[in-house]
Amino acid sequence: MVARSPNAKPDRQKAAALAAAAALNPALLRETLKKVDRCMARLQELQYTVAGGAKVVSGVSLSPRSTRGYLRTSLRCKQETVRMRGGASAQKRSPSGKFGGGVGGEGAQWRRMSLPAMLLGETVLEIVQASQFARDIVTAAGATNREPPRTPKPAPRTRKPAAGEPTPLRARRAREKQSHRGGAATRGADAATPPSRSRVRSRIQFKPVSPVAVGRPSVSANRVSPKNRPWAKKAVMFPNPTFHASTSAATDPCATPSPSKKQKRLYKTRSPVAARQTPHKFLVKSPPSALGSKLRMHGKALPARPAAVSPPPPVKAQASPAKTRRCSFSPSRLATRLMSPIKARLSLGRSRDSGVGVGGGPMSGLKQRPGVSLTVRTVSSKISSR
């Protein structure tokens, strides 16, 4: 079920509101109460007239012929009877359709109508009107209480407290400011006194300062990048034993051969000792034997190994630049030589001259092509015989 919006069917709501306002009018309510009281009095008069007795209502003895309403109604009945009986009234007779023209018809019934009957008719009519008004009041009251469902209005947003409204945080800040101002006045006289406890609690101290570090001069101990360090101070993960005492003693003339100084000059990481002329970066040496390293640690020098001298490589005979050119077999070249025998002779002579090496024999290391030379020789011999 969807709730109706407040603006749905405004005409019907306006009419219901007007009816409720008219029904709940205080002046109309007072008039209705008075009318109901009169109806009750008339009903009591009718009851007394029919019964023929006297009743006491609210301590007052009422006679059927003593009320003002009874006297007024009885006067009207007498006037109507005189009008119907008199001669003048006979000429001005009512039309036949109203009371009936017959002597023994409704006219006789009207004459026989008594005063209690007239009182009863008026009382019933007023009771019907009062009951209808009471129903309207009940309907209006029920409609007021049973309103159709409406969309609830949005709740107002909680506004922030104004500057003047006291909050616990504002009160605390005001006390802190007041204490801070009061302490600032006496700060010049007594600078050694610490601040108040509440003020210290409210302040945030990110980095506590030790009293020892206050007196010392500040020393910057920033980390140095390894690439900016000198060569000797760089950490070596896997130290090379060939760079220890032998390298430094050979390259540094000022280095002393005493083992104690050598041990002192070595670093904890067993990295090479800084020398005046550092060894080359890509210099690779074969590591010494285990016995030699033990003797070196004890300070004893070993005789140097004789360097193994290998025989020099044989010098190959250099080929002539004419023969280094590769001569491959090609049908087009062969056809060209067949067409021009002079060129074939020249090329054949060149090949013969170049085929002889320094010692008069063929050159070693070059691939000989006997098939091509044989073919060229046979072709040239045929051409010369012709």
Swiss-Prot record:
Which cellular component, as a GO term, is one annotated location?
Answer: phragmoplast
* Start-end of Basic residues biased regions: 170-180
Q: Which domain of life is it from?
A: Eukaryota
Deletion phenotype, per the entry, is: Mutant tan1 displays a shorter stature with smaller, more erect leaves than normal. Moreover, mutant leaves have a distinctly roughened, crepe-papery texture compared to the smooth surface of a normal leaf.
Expression by tissue, per the entry, reads:
Expressed in vegetative shoot tips consisting of leaf primordia and the bases of immature leaves, the shoot apical meristem, and unexpanded stem tissue. Strongly expressed in tissues enriched in dividing cells: ear primordia and embryos.
Instruction: State the compartments where it is located.
Output: Cytoplasm; Cytoplasm, Cytoskeleton; Cytoplasm, Cytoskeleton, Spindle; Cytoplasm, Cytoskeleton, Phragmoplast
Entry keyword annotation includes Cell membrane = no
| Region: Disordered, residue numbers | 83-105, 140-202, 244-266, 303-330, 345-386
GO molecular function annotation: microtubule binding
Which controlled-vocabulary keywords does the entry list? Cytoplasm, Cytoskeleton
Composition bias type Low complexity, residue spans: 181-193
InterPro entries assigned: TAN1
**Spans of biased composition, class Polar residues?**
375-386
Q: Name one GO biological process term.
A: regulation of phragmoplast microtubule organization
Tell me, what does this protein do in biology? Is required for spatial control cell division during leaf development. Through an association with microtubules, acts both for the positioning of cytoskeletal arrays that establish planes of cell division during prophase and for spatial guidance of expanding phragmoplasts toward preestablished cortical division sites (CDS) during cytokinesis.
Which PANTHER family does the record cross-reference, listed alphabetically?
A: MICROTUBULE-BINDING PROTEIN TANGLED-RELATED
Q: What is this protein called?
A: Microtubule-binding protein TANGLED1
The species this protein belongs to is: Zea mays (Maize)
Ranked from the top, the taxonomy reads:
Eukaryota, Viridiplantae, Streptophyta, Embryophyta, Tracheophyta
